[in-house]
Amino acid sequence: MNEQYYSTGRRKTASARVFIKIGKGKIKINYIDIKKYFNQKTYITLIKKPLEIINMTDKLDIFITVKGGGISGQAGAIRHGIARALIKYDSSLKTTLRDSGFITRDSRCVERKKVGFKKARRRPQFSKR
């Protein structure tokens, strides 16, 4: 019973490929341990949140390859990918993960810069005279 479950997660411009199999709770991101890849504890807790809700932190090994975006976007993409892979592992988890908001893809991304503006919404300074 060495089955592997695969899913993708996306956030901003980052995309993560997540592979889950039954193990001892190891998490590797791009062949690097999670604590070395994300040195801030907030990102590690964000990633482990779906596993904590279903009490599977020490039962699954997770291997992740992530590309694009920054640290925050990559952490969000990994969390999204883990949640989707857990549903493939056990479909009965879908309701609990959906209620927690892990399945829904966060569609917020950077607003584009408009012509004539300094930034996305910042207009040039107005001069009366």
Curated annotation (Swiss-Prot):
Molecular function GO terms recorded: RNA binding; structural constituent of ribosome
Keywords from the named record: Ribonucleoprotein, Ribosomal protein
An annotated GO BP: translation
Pfam families, per the entry: Ribosomal_S9
Family that this chain belongs to: Belongs to the universal ribosomal protein uS9 family.
A single cellular component GO annotation: cytosolic small ribosomal subunit
Name of this chain's protein: Small ribosomal subunit protein uS9
InterPro entries xref list: Ribosomal_Su5_D2-typ_SF, Ribosomal_uS9, Ribosomal_uS9_bac/plastid, Ribosomal_uS9_CS, Ribsml_uS5_D2-typ_fold_subgr
Protein's UniProt keywords contain Ribonucleoprotein: yes
Source species: Wigglesworthia glossinidia brevipalpis
PANTHER family (UniProt xref): RIBOSOMAL PROTEIN S9, SMALL RIBOSOMAL SUBUNIT PROTEIN US9M
